[in-house]
Amino acid sequence: MTTPAGSGTGYGSVSWWGLSPALDLQAESPPVDPDSQSKTERKVPELDALLLGSVDGRHMLRTLARAALWPLRSFNFYVLENNLEAVARHMLIFSLALEEPEKMGLQERSETFLELWGNALLRPSVAAFLRAQASHLANLVLEPDRLEEQLPWLSLRLLKFRERDALEAVFRFWSGGEKGPEVFPMSRLWDSRLRHYLGSRYDARRGVADWDLRMKLHDRGAQVIHIQEFRRWRDTGVAFELRDLSAYHVPNRTLASGRLLSHRGERVAARGYWGDIATGPFMAFGIEADDQSLLRTRNGQPVKTASEITQHNVTELFREVAAWRGPRAIQGNVEETESPEPDVPAQEPFTIHFLPLDSSQTLHHKTCYQGRFQLLYVSCGMVHLLSPELGACVAPGGNLVVELARYLVDLRPKELKAFSDRVVEIARVAGFAPHTATKPSETFARFYKLGDSTPGGGDSAVESGPAPSKVESTRAPLPESISPPQANQAPSLEAMSPPLADLAPPLETMCPPQANQAPPLEALSPSKADQIPPLEAMSPPQAKLVLPVEAISLPQADLASPPEVISPLQEAMATSWVNAPPKHVT
């Protein structure tokens, strides 16, 4: 229910972009063990990383871009999201980032990426590219052989069949299977979310944006975000204005997701925008840079905006990835690379494996995952999934990186501290210990695995796979002590860490609060019953079952009850809302 002070839920219930800078995962993982490497001299060492809620692939892109500064290594990224729309965006982003230069130039690729990734509205040319690419991906999803041939870096074999069907439906919706802007009226949906979030402060929304930027984001390290670009994004959803603002008028369908609502006593599926409307997509690539000249200030003001820094960083990222993939493509082992067969395509030096949406608590049952991963990354919205069972999948001495809620404007310092303490407690229970010698970071917390705490034995018949990797030392070296061997390397982006709660849309966004109770936050950990496939996959028999968000008057008193599982981030945000003093913005 909207209160005079607003709902206090600008974070959203599903994440589309990272709320912290990108990380080089090699710098965060333990170094290659020389003993184990000598035993397999002819094999290229591998990095197995498990990422929960990475959302936009920024950490993987950053890792690939920096790979040329490290010894030769191949990568196996295992990605777990809580909604299939996020999986589809991963596929779209990487297919764009790895597009052949002959088909699309570097500048065009970077501009297209920024609009698809962070803008609510698109230019017609970018919308046409989205339709064509989505149609192509929809045809590949259901044909594993063609998918492996055309996108050898992608593996969907671990997804369930119904998830692949739903994924294909997402791409069909993106490709324009349902015509007309009324199918997804983004501008109206954005304004509806904004009104619900601000309440009576809606008419003073420019003042609210100024306060959130100057008194919160700037104080927390994001000084390069300019007030004009932040206001524009808060008002229209357009974060990156690469052309005249009037050129952006086509809804970005990649930001659409479905959720179950209760309408007149019946549970119905509604498509809408349930993402972030408070912080913005500036944190992932826009507040840090290898080129320190981009962060200079003049008369106390940054000379570059977050949008300009983001465009520069993304362009350099794509350039470095393209340069690394060419000469360093791996052909299985060193000997084979010298004389590959002419008809056999070169093996990609990395593979992205997408895991089933509900597999976080069952991975340890499969022996191929027990003690396999040298690195586990968890976003702030997925912290509740960190458990001893998940910790059993990390090799002894492996590292854990947890994103903190530093850039969530709805949380006050007191709630941020409580959330950080809760993260430490959850990590200890899962079998990890903090890196006490590391420099404290407000962006994310770092831990290492204590010994081998595999809970029970796994069933080797469940799934076969390569033997899990082991890290020799009980305590992994600190991330700050790990750096590429080159002397001329650019400074690493320590602050660039992954946030974003990419969790399936909950039902509480519009739930009215009780008299003495804060309104439930948009669930970061929705119950299984509320996790629905994309609307196209549901094929409802009656048109009345699929309603736009405006068809359901906001807020509704008969919305479905909130899920029982409450994540630590949700608790912190609820506390923030309860203790919030009345806000008066003039």
Swiss-Prot record:
- Say which family it is in: Belongs to the DNAAF3 family.
According to its UniProt entry, one GO biological process term is: heart development
Region annotation (Disordered) maps to 455-493
Kindly provide the name given to this protein in its UniProt entry.
Dynein axonemal assembly factor 3
Q: Looking at the UniProt record for this protein, which Gene Ontology cellular component terms does it annotate, in alphabetical order?
A: dynein axonemal particle; extracellular region
The alphabetized UniProt keywords are: Cilium biogenesis/degradation, Cytoplasm
- Which subcellular locations apply to this protein? Cytoplasm; Dynein axonemal particle
Q: Give the protein's biological function.
A: Required for the assembly of axonemal inner and outer dynein arms. Involved in preassembly of dyneins into complexes before their transport into cilia.
Q: Which Pfam families match?
A: DUF4470, DUF4471
Q: InterPro entries in the record, alphabetically?
A: DNAAF3 (IPR039304), DNAAF3_C (IPR028235), DUF4470 (IPR027974)
